[in-house]
Amino acid sequence: AASDVYKRQSYQFQDTEHAANLFALKELGHIYTRIGNPTTAVLEERLAALEGGAAALALASGQAASAYAIQNLAKVGDNIVSSTDLYGGTWNLFANTLKDQGIETRFVDPADPENFRRATDARTRAYYAETLPNPKLTVFPISEVADIGKEYGVPLIIDNTAAPILSRPFDHGAAIIVYSTTKYLAGHGAAIGGAIIAVS
């Protein structure tokens, strides 16, 4: 069922105490649309339910989702280990933008899950892969790589853009799922968006 669309950028407060509680995060509610609104909240709840996750965060694009997920785990001097089989935009994000921010990406061939182990060190903060990578569509070994990550305390981030109805990465050990909602979730390519979903 379709939900209402809220087009406002700010919200009315009951009184100053209500506003203070919202801004102090003592009370849940909407403050400013960039942070969240009722329409976005419905999307986030539905995406979390689709994947069996605890919560979701809607963002402006799939690239934003990938960047947010990694930048919340890694900082200057850290690294991530990524599958070589990636959408070109994600490859460029990792090889250039993250590098410029001081986060190294170690690209490995996903055909052998042990490549993730071999590339892991004390500064590895995440593993990253696509369920069905664009354009190869080779199935990524989620369970095997997630198990390796658990040995080192390294979460597996899975881009599930190509397979949201076909695959539930949390069921196979992934810790975080990202999407470009522009593709199959939007259904017609008329809206750009992205999302991050956290495991329960």
Language model: regions and residue ranges:
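C-terminal substrate-binding/catalytic lobe of Rossmann-fold NAD(P)-dependent oxidoreductases
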Residues: 7-13, 17
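Residue-level marker of positions within ordered structural domains that often coincide
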Residues: 12, 52, 199
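Conserved N-terminal alpha-helix of the aminotransferase class I/II PLP-enzyme fold
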Residues: 15-67, 89-97
